[in-house]
A protein has these predicted regions:
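Catalytic-core regions of glycoside hydrolase
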Residues: 62, 145-149, 157-312
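Catalytic domains of carbohydrate-active enzymes that cleave complex glycans
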Residues: 314-317
Length: 317
């Protein structure tokens, strides 16, 4: 059973560095944007990274999903890096350390247009020959660096105009183009004998199309961060629909929305998804890996440890 933690190496996954919206900026949004805006330097504390890994090991977690973004000096495209980005040599050293702790490292590059600011100039070249070549190069390089990982998370969530309402530049692929680019990315991953993994957002809005066109080979991470779980909630119903259609799942929770969410995700999905198709669970925090957020990172791991204990009690009863 997978017990995974999503950790950001890069964090330029939302609005541009100079995004200063002219409207809709109430105080809560200002606070969020102050964290999310892209920066020309790496927001990553190595001491905290090591502490997180140690706590994960102690908690019984066995997978870390590394959201790489601009956090790496890609040899194929060094222009994507920012000040402080890891060298490929540094990344390989860290991956070796992670594996020695009994934790499986999995790469994530989010190619959703909502979350691709990390691509730098290429985020404004979507669906062009240049874009496809860059995506291919990055997937090839990352698969090699991670030594043919079991999974490769491609993101692909929240690609809507509404989600990009505070960005300076918004682009949305729709209909056949979204699927064309999605299949392209999946094919590039599978070319390395690696299994693609994505967020399941598309299902919420277009279930009929999703089940007609989504390959069963692609691992699904539906995500729901609420406290109430019942099938009348569309985001919760997605877990049931994915199960009924035979997809492998790694349900995803979040610690910032409340301590109850992850445990309830484990409880609900353990009861409603076949053990054959329930690959594990993923915890998220959606904050930089930096000292100001240390407490929240460690609290997220503590919550997973409770989820692990709950799961084993349920299975053994």
């Amino acid at each position: 059973m997978i017990w995974a933690n999503l950790i950001h190496l890069g964090f330029n996954m939302w609005e541009e560095h100079d995004a200063k919206p002219l409207y809709g900026m109430e105080s809560r949004i200002k606070k969020i944007l102050n964290i999310r805006r892209a920066q020309p330097y790496l927001r990553f504390d190595e001491e905290l990274w090591n502490e997180i890994l140690a706590h994960m090991k102690k908690a019984g977690m066995n997978m870390v999903v590394v959201d790489i973004g601009e956090g790496l000096q890609y040899e194929s495209h060094p222009e994507i890096a920012v000040k402080g980005s890891w060298t490929t040599k540094k990344l390989k050293k860290e991956l070796k350390k992670v594996r020695s702790m009994g934790i499986e490292p999995i790469p994530k590059l989010n190619f959703s247009t909502m979350h691709d600011t990390w691509l730098g100039p290429y985020s404004r070249c979507v669906s062009t020959d240049t874009y496809y070549n860059v995506c291919r190069d990055l997937i090839d390089e990352v698969c090699c660096l991670f030594e043919k990982p079991r999974f490769f998370h491609l993101g692909m969530d929240e690609e809507t105009a509404n989600h990009q309402c505070f960005s300076l530049y918004a682009v949305v692929r729709q209909h056949h183009l979204w699927w064309h680019d999605f299949y392209f990315l999946v094919d590039e991953v599978e070319r390395h004998n690696v299994r693609a993994w994505v967020w399941s957002d598309y299902l919420w809005y277009h279930p009929d199309i999703f089940f007609k066109k989504m390959p069963k080979t692609v691992v699904q991470s539906n995500w729901y961060y609420g406290k109430i779980f019942n099938k009348n909630i569309n985001y919760v119903k997605a877990y049931l629909d994915l199960e009924n259609h035979g997809y492998d799942q790694i349900p995803t929770g979040n610690s910032r929305s409340g301590k109850e969410n992850f445990i309830r995700t484990v409880s609900y999905c353990t009861s409603h998804i076949s053990q054959k198709r329930l690959l594990g669970f993923l915890q998220t925090i959606w904050l930089p890996t930096t000292k100001p957020f240390r407490k929240k990172h460690l609290e997220a791991i503590k919550i997973v440890s409770k989820g692990i204990r709950y799961f084993h009690r349920e299975i053994n009863e």
